[in-house]
Amino acid sequence: SEAVAAYYVSIAGGDLHADKSNGSNNHDIKKKLRSIQAVVYDQYHYHGNYDHYEELENADLCSVIERRKGMPISLSIICMYVAKAQGWNIVGIGLPGHFICRLEANGERIIFDPFHHANIVNAVDLRRLLKLALGSEAELKPEHYQAISNRKTLLRLQNNIKQRQVDKHNFLDAIITLDTMRKIAPDEAELLLDAGQLYAQAKQPRAAINALSRYLDHSPSQYGRTKASVLIQQMKRQLD
């Protein structure tokens, strides 16, 4: 509602109606970040679930909202929702092994980490996060901190759920999650390869063959096509 929006903007030190009439934001970018911190973390007490990071609930938005704790990407989505409700320019950044946000206003940019109370992240922090995920030899490149689309953000969130289900050998649940991912990105051929592999792990060779055959019809990846062809032959032998 407008009352809620006015409350958020007031924390940032601004005027809701002035923003709308001018079509631009005149608030200091750090005040915007402080307003996100005040609302998401101080008022509603969201926080990163450091102690039980691998819990499936950390990637389930309904559970995150109920428990007020989650993983980097789920908390990033909460922060992005709050900022976008005010018309602020915010995007998600999918670092390998971590997820952060970038806020922009009046030509200034701030990168912050929703998993750690929306603290500002600098180049040194980015390198450290990258090396934690990819090893000490990894070097920070521009593609590592490029903004990703809302669709890719949702896919990454669902992939976190799927991976946790696979780790627990809940292959049928993982297939359901993957079906959701395919609805989000129906043209993403790699999801058919993932589906084929999951069906194979779930002891459903016919479904695996069907998904992998469809993958072969759509994928240009020679490596993926070879992998799919080998798995199809394995599934056919199970049916013999």
Task: Cite the ranges covered by each PLM segment.
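A structural boundary/capping signal
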Residues: 1-240
